[in-house]
Amino acid sequence: MQAKAIAKYVRISPLKVNFICKEIRGKQVDEALAILKFTPKKGARILEKVLNSAIANAEHNFGLNREDLFVSQAYANNAPVMKRWRPKAKGMAYPILKRSSHVGVVVEEREL
């Protein structure tokens, strides 16, 4: 049985979050939470909230046991990009892309 949680339109680049997603993929949920707690990145705080939500969804909606859960998927997909302009020399302007993400975590029950 799978339970998932998604945080949409999070104002952080997907590249930065996917770097941390790779660390927790396939880990037991308590181990993944410990890794996220001691990772000094903004993306880790976001992933921690989404993972806690996925765990709560698994326990409440499906009655799954927390000790049997592991992170089967952790991902950050592209969301809409805000475009801003930076003034440059000789009256020119360069674009600044402020990227955002859709962060998702799927937890599954470990098969024995």
Swiss-Prot record:
InterPro entries: Ribosomal_uL22 (IPR001063), Ribosomal_uL22_bac/chlpt-type (IPR005727), Ribosomal_uL22_bac/org-type (IPR047867), Ribosomal_uL22_sf (IPR036394). One of its GO terms (biological process) is translation. GO terms for cellular component: cytosolic large ribosomal subunit. This is Large ribosomal subunit protein uL22. The keyword Ribosomal protein applies. It comes from Finegoldia magna (strain ATCC 29328 / DSM 20472 / WAL 2508) (Peptostreptococcus magnus). Coiled coil: none annotated. Belongs to the universal ribosomal protein uL22 family. GO terms for molecular function: rRNA binding; structural constituent of ribosome. The keyword Protein transport does not apply.
